[in-house]
Structures are given as structure tokens and as C-alpha cells.
């Protein structure tokens, strides 16, 4: 790569949107987890908030597929970014990435987006709680704290199934060995089948264990990411001890595609059953300016559902207002948007909405 690649005059800054990137490195983190590192062909500074995520635009067996992954790298290393992916037995996308994505592969990403980050919630004392591959956004935050010499009292508690499942193990130990105010605690559900010894905490994270590791956990800003049962257990401990939940922040993995399809089918059946009971005067018109198509929909139906009924395909990944993939511009009218961090305040001010979680309050016009 030539020195001109890093010319600050020609270097662009990453903004929320659609970008072409190329895989430049693949790292085997554990037996079933890989990190994929990306750069742009034209120099781009990948600025984002530690904890945010991107959505990959892929083609698998001839079908367009969108999937969101947290950025595991730190914005303090701005010319590239990384995602860390666990290979799931029935995971269509994760298996495809592990089998097909290699150095030189090109793809499209959308983002960065997400409210789960340490920039918007600064604190002097931080507790990070992660389970399994939920360590990825917290690793981005930890790398950021380390690289920027942040004056933060950080306690990090990570739970893994076995010692060989500990993601970023060596790097975490390196980081926490060099900063006096950083403390690392690792919990393994059990030892390795190979018999590898594990002298650390064993079992599942519980109140007694948390109190032993982090006695002042109720005084900290808490960032949590992991499987739903893990986060549910964490919240139960916190709430039962009077923790102020305004200082608790979490990132979940969301529903699986099968769950989303089941929800869609259930809602479609419900909508059909209720159609006869709806006064047509209550229905609202949704117009799509680029296609010249419009449709009247029932109250509480989303802009995305309106587009689908017209045969218009607005890209979508999570279906829950998290990933930001379905962002479109509203030209007229009012909507109610109940998102989960997938859109910035700046984009909202500019008239953008997330079609998957926006329901019209009046007749609306959409640029699509």
C-alpha cells in the first residue's frame, strides 16, 4: 500500500450509510470464532462510537441477506474496522462468513449505528458484563479506554462456557495487566473436556459471585451484552438490590430470522382477521415517490409493511429498529417511530425514519 493511501487531504470520514469495503485480515480467535478486518479501497477514517454496530449486505445462494454485527475494534485505529463472528450450528450467515469470507473478499456494509456506547454515557466507574460472543462491543469499549489512556475505573466480568471459549483472552489479560484501575474477572461454566485446568471462577454469574468480584457494582455505570437469559439474570440481580436502572445499558442479539418470520405471519393473520372491523375512513395513505405507488393501510401498520404490500423491497435486517438498515426519508406527513437506537438524532432532524418501526399518524410520503 502506498504512502498516498494515508494522505489526509484525500481521506474521507465514515458516515452512516452504504459503503464498499474489502476484507484485509481474518483472525481465528477461538475454535468457532473469527474476527474479520476490513478497509476501504479508497482511504476512509472509520470513526464510530465504541459499542456501535454495522449491517452486512450479503448475497447467499442468490438471495440478498442483511445481518448486523457489532464492531469489535476501536475507533482509535481508524483506517480499518473489525467484526467478530461466532459460528453457530444453524446460523446461515455465520456459517457462510466462516466458509466464504477471506482476505480480498469485497462486500457492502451499512452503518455505523447504535445507542449502546460509552461515549454517550461517560462515567468514572464502569462495570462491563459480557456472556459469550457478547464480549464484542465491550471489547471495542475496552480497547478505546486503553488506547486513549482514559481515566476510568473499569471492572470487566466475562462469562464463557469453557476456557477454550474465552474470546480475546490473551489481549484482555494484556490490557488489564498494564492499567492499575482495570480489573478483569473471567467465569467459566465448566472446565474443558480435554482436561485443561481452570483455576478461576466456575459456574454461572450470580449475586454472590458478583459481590465478591466487584463489591461496589451498585455504584457503577453498567454495560451488559450477552444471550437473553444472561442479561435477564443480570437485571434481576440489579433490580432486586435497588440499582438505578438508568445507569444500566444493554445490547442484545435480537430475534432470529425464524422468530421474525413467525412474528410476521402472526401479525398478518391478525391483520386479516381485523380488516373487516376497520372503518376505511380511519385508514391512512402511504405514498412512495420514486416508484409512484401508494397504498392505504390499517392503523398501526408500519411503513415497511405498506411497501411490502406494494412489492417494494426496502432493505431490512433486524426488524426491531436496531440496525438502521431500513432507513428511508420521509417527505411529508407524521409517523410514530419506536426504534431501539438504529437512527441518530441528526438523521431524524433531516427527516429520516426507520420503516420497520414507523407507523403513520397521517398520510405520509416516502422517498423510495
Curated annotation (Swiss-Prot):
Coiled coil: none annotated. The keyword Repeat does not apply. One of its GO terms (molecular function) is 2 iron, 2 sulfur cluster binding. Its cofactor is FAD; [2Fe-2S] cluster. Residues 284-368 form the 2Fe-2S ferredoxin-type domain. Disruption phenotype: Can use glucose or dimethylglycine as the sole carbon source, but is incapable of growth on glycine betaine as the sole source of carbon. In the N-terminal section; belongs to the FAD-binding oxidoreductase type 6 family. Monomer. The system is composed of an oxygenase subunit (BmoA) and a reductase subunit (BmoB). Maximal specific activity is obtained when the ratio of BmoA to BmoB is 5:1. This is Glycine betaine monooxygenase reductase subunit. It comes from Chromohalobacter salexigens (strain ATCC BAA-138 / DSM 3043 / CIP 106854 / NCIMB 13768 / 1H11). The lineage of its organism: Bacteria, Pseudomonadati, Pseudomonadota, Gammaproteobacteria, Oceanospirillales. The gene is bmoB.
Amino acid at each position: 500500500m502506498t504512502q498516498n493511501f494515508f494522505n489526509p487531504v484525500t481521506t474521507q470520514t465514515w458516515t452512516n450509510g452504504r459503503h464498499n469495503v474489502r476484507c484485509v485480515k481474518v483472525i481465528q480467535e477461538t475454535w468457532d470464532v473469527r474476527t474479520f478486518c476490513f478497509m476501504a479501497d479508497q482511504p476512509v477514517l472509520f470513526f464510530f462510537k465504541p459499542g456501535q454496530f454495522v449491517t452486512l449486505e450479503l448475497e447467499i445462494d442468490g438471495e440478498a441477506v442483511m445481518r448486523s454485527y457489532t464492531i469489535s475494534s476501536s475507533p482509535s485505529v481508524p483506517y480499518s474496522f473489525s467484526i467478530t463472528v461466532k459460528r453457530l450450528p444453524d446460523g446461515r450467515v455465520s456459517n457462510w462468513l466462516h466458509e466464504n469470507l477471506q482476505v480480498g473478499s469485497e462486500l457492502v456494509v451499512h452503518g455505523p449505528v447504535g445507542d449502546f456506547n460509552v461515549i454517550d454515557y461517560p462515567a468514572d466507574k464502569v462495570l462491563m458484563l459480557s456472556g459469550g460472543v457478547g464480549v464484542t462491543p465491550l471489547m471495542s469499549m475496552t480497547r478505546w479506554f486503553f488506547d486513549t489512556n482514559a481515566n476510568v475505573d473499569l471492572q470487566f466480568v466475562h462469562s464463557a462456557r469453557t476456557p477454550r471459549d474465552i474470546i480475546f483472552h490473551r489481549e484482555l489479560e494484556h490490557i488489564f495487566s498494564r492499567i492499575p484501575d482495570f480489573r478483569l474477572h473471567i467465569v467459566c461454566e465448566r472446565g474443558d473436556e480435554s482436561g485443561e485446568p481452570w483455576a478461576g471462577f466456575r459456574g454461572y454469574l450470580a449475586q454472590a459471585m458478583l459481590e465478591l468480584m466487584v463489591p461496589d457494582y451498585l455504584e457503577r455505570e453498567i454495560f451488559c451484552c450477552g444471550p437473553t437469559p444472561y442479561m435477564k439474570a443480570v437485571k434481576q440481580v440489579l433490580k432486586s438490590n435497588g440499582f438505578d436502572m438508568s445507569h444500566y445499558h444493554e445490547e442484545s442479539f435480537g430475534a432470529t430470522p425464524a422468530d421474525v418470520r413467525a412474528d410476521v405471519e402472526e401479525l398478518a393473520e391478525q391483520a386479516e382477521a381485523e380488516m373487516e372491523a376497520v372503518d376505511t375512513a380511519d385508514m391512512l395513505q402511504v405514498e412512495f415517490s420514486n416508484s409512484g405507488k401508494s397504498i392505504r393501510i390499517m392503523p398501526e401498520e408500519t411503513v415497511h409493511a405498506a411497501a411490502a404490500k406494494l412489492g417494494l423491497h426496502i432493505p431490512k435486517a433486524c426488524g426491531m429498529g436496531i440496525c438502521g438498515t431500513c432507513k428511508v426519508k420521509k417527505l411529508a406527513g407524521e409517523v410514530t417511530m419506536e426504534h431501539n437506537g438504529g437512527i441518530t438524532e441528526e438523521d431524524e432532524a433531516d427527516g429520516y425514519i426507520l420503516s420497520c418501526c414507523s407507523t403513520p399518524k397521517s398520510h405520509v410520503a416516502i422517498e423510495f
